[in-house]
Amino acid sequence: MNTNDEKIQWHPAFDAALQIEFGDEAKYLEFDPEHLISKKPMQIDVLVKNEKHVKLRKNIGRIFRQYNIIEYKSPEDDLDIDDFYKTYAYACLYKSETETVDLIPADELTITFVCYHYPRNMLRKLEQDRKFSVEQQDSGIYYLVGDAIPIQLVIVPKLSKEHNYWLNNLRNDLKAGSEIKNFIESYSKNKNSKLYQALADAVMRANWEK
């Protein structure tokens, strides 16, 4: 467990890991962390715009449309039913807080929840109250089916180490020795990138005692 007095900046590290994950496809996307959705103090963790309507191959981006709202929970936080409705409300506010009517089409919105613990209680509530169903699309990636807005759930520790290496390593429970050593070696090849630096800083501090 990390005992560093200074709070680890998980959200900037997640934003960096997210951009890294998309690799060459990131150039088609606009990433806007902590996007303010109105003049009031409400903000989306990350807003990803696909203005060019590129069909993404990356597994976490296949669900994406033009405007993609992402809610991220750090390793210490759980995703609950109130988080679901808050983020859903943010998506609706983002669609409506525009200068002209229907500037952002509802069918161009998606919602992604990224967390570390499978939210059983939240999903059970959605299944009971909203008749949602959960469909696994890939390792750690689930679609919540039953709403007009496409919704996906990403469980960081369950992501593929092959296809989502950097996001999968954004954790505070890397195994001492092998996983940490491999992370350092992989990072050393990209250490001049500010994105990789932000990610590595959080990961190394979170796993410092190991």
Regions found by a protein language model. Name each.
Residues 1-210:
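Elongated, amphipathic alpha-helical interaction scaffolds
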